[in-house]
Amino acid sequence: MKTILSSETMDIPDGVAIKVNAKVIEVEGPRGKLTRDFKHLNLDFQLIKDQVTGKRQLKIDSWFGSRKTSASIRTALSHVDNLIAGVTQGFLYRMRFVYAHFPINASIDGNNKSIEIRNFLGEKKVRKVEMLDGVKIVRSEKVKDEIILEGNDIELVSRSCALINQKCHVKKKDIRKFLDGIYVSEKGKIAVEE
């Protein structure tokens, strides 16, 4: 069954500028600027002003859409919400080194843009992981064997974490027993709202 019109709106917070140009959304805030392309979705994006409250809103419409198209409205809203959170607060992921015997040594270099992992399972091989654009990596001062990744784009930060995690993949051993690696321990935002 096709629905004639499905639409949802979301409020745009103060201090955030949004531009919509042919399904390309550009969000600008205190932490910087992010853009996202929604050309693959059959949706209409509009910037409107609420009649009652006078707040700026982003309205997403889907005309004559199936259930999947209607579901993509909520997905697009979530992506825009992540863009707004990124330019206002930023995203922070914490990763912990897990090892049973051989301590993992990691050195951060290249102006906080890459990490070199040594002594993983006692191997001599040096694993180097470059961070994606806009992602900064630092060592935690408070907690031993912890690194912190931060950036504005949640997808780039989480993909950088995945790259680090995949470099420390245990091969030719039972992964239920050999749990060594670098794992994400905490996800959050840099600037916490009061």
From Swiss-Prot:
Gene3D superfamilies: Ribosomal protein L6, alpha-beta domain. SUPFAM superfamilies: Ribosomal protein L6. GO terms for molecular function: mRNA binding; rRNA binding; structural constituent of ribosome. GO terms for biological process: translation. Pfam families: Ribosomal_L6 (PF00347). It comes from the Eukaryota. The keyword Hydrolase does not apply. The keyword Hydrolase does not apply. The modification Phosphothreonine is found at residue 75. GO terms for cellular component: cytosol; cytosolic large ribosomal subunit; cytosolic ribosome. InterPro entries: Ribosomal_uL6-like (IPR000702), Ribosomal_uL6-like_a/b-dom_sf (IPR036789), Ribosomal_uL6_a/b-dom (IPR020040), Ribosomal_uL6_CS2 (IPR002359). Keywords: Phosphoprotein, Ribonucleoprotein, Ribosomal protein. Belongs to the universal ribosomal protein uL6 family. PANTHER family: 60S/50S RIBOSOMAL PROTEIN L6/L9, LARGE RIBOSOMAL SUBUNIT PROTEIN UL6X. This is Large ribosomal subunit protein uL6x.
